[in-house]
Amino acid sequence: NTLRYLLTKNAADRDVSIIEGVMGYYDGMGLTTTHASSYEVSKVTDSPVVLVVSAKGASLSVLATIQGFLTFCPDSNIRGVILNQISPMTYTALAKEIESRFGICAYGYLPKMTDCTLESRHLGLVTAAEVENLREKLQVMAAQAEKSIDLNGLLKLAESVNPVSY
């Protein structure tokens, strides 16, 4: 109930709310439970999930990874994917396979962008104050996202969701 309350309160007068997941999608408070995982948050809030999958150095294995997420818990709420660190050509081929095999949407991709790398450490990203040229990096990433991610499709997915009530 606390989660639903906080989302309802903070989403008031907003068109779209984005809930960012933590760690692995099914990783919860313990090693063998989904309690407090991003999966559980999606269930409690009845939110559709767009999984961001690293495709670095892979092709068909990306499909196996996605299939694993979809079948691990059949009620996963996963409605689509965005592939990260992938070439446009490979994305085009994999997107067709993702949509035909799994019936979920491939919303786009981000290519490898070495000039825009955001460092991380054990428990997450470094703080904004620690990132050199952050504003410029974000502008470059935003411009790329506008080119290679179906932002209208993501908005359409968001519009299909019933508002969370408390």
Residue map of PLM features:
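ATP-dependent carboxylate-amine ligase catalytic core
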Residues: 1-45, 53-80, 88-93
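Internal gly/pro-rich beta-alpha loop/helix module
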Residues: 60-166
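Short hydrophobic alpha-helical runs that function as membrane-insertion/retention elements
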Residues: 49-52, 107-109
